Regions:
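Structural signal for the C-terminal ends of transmembrane alpha-helices
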Residues: 1, 45-48, 85-93, 153-160
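Hydrophobic transmembrane alpha-helices
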Residues: 1-42, 46, 50-54
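Juxtamembrane loop-helix boundary motifs flanking transmembrane segments in multi-pass membrane proteins
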Residues: 2, 6, 14, 53-56, ...
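Interfacial aromatic-anchored transmembrane helix boundaries in multi-pass membrane proteins
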Residues: 21-34, 57-89, 117-121
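Hydrophobic transmembrane alpha-helices of multi-pass small-molecule transporters
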Residues: 38-41, 63, 67, 83, ...
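Central hydrophobic cores of alpha-helical transmembrane segments
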Residues: 52-63, 97-107
Length: 168
């Protein structure tokens, strides 16, 4: 791979990570409504080589902005897992499928995050933490579903056009 292509991919990863942070910040006033899941799924589908770098930038910047607490440890696996699952299902090109997938991931988000507490605290604590946040997980799932249903097709087309222009 030419040096130019490697540099372009590195810059893309950084820009994608920054976009994740900025878009999350822009919607931070809305409870559990975030575009990160939508964007990560689309990145994994259209720019799979750059996605791990983008996730790394996003996670590190979230730690810098909000502190590297126990919540941050959750981010070390939930976002990579989402990208991996999307990449494994990359042949699907159906907005409704991805809306359901994203909605279910949002619904399961608290359960996935609670896994940290299995090791950091106790299984009872992890279960109570997860159950106490189910209403937020429901909002997260609904928000993910709606955002994906509305924005999957136009954003995927935009990414495909950008890829052609950048020749990546």
């Amino acid at each position: 791979m030419a040096l130019h292509t490697r540099v372009l991919r590195l810059v893309l990863s950084g820009l994608m990570g920054a976009l994740l942070v900025v878009s999350k910040q822009a919607m931070s006033g809305l409870p559990n409504l975030e575009p990160v899941s939508l964007l990560l799924i689309l990145f994994a589908l259209e720019l799979p080589r750059e996605t791990p770098g983008a996730i790394t930038v996003f996670i590190l910047l979230q730690g810098v902005l909000y502190g590297f607490g126990l919540w941050w440890v959750m981010y070390l696996y939930v976002w990579y897992l989402l990208a991996l699952l999307a990449w494994l299902l990359h042949r699907m090109d159906n907005a409704f499928f991805w809306a359901v997938f994203s909605g279910l991931y949002g619904l399961c988000f608290g359960g996935l995050c609670a896994a940290v507490y299995l090791f950091a605290k106790t299984p009872a604590f992890a279960l109570s933490w997860w159950l106490s946040g189910l209403s937020y997980d429901a909002l997260h799932g609904i928000g993910n579903f709606v955002l994906m249903l509305l924005l999957y097709r136009p954003l995927r087309r935009a990414l495909q056009m950008a890829k052609k222009q950048l020749r990546v």
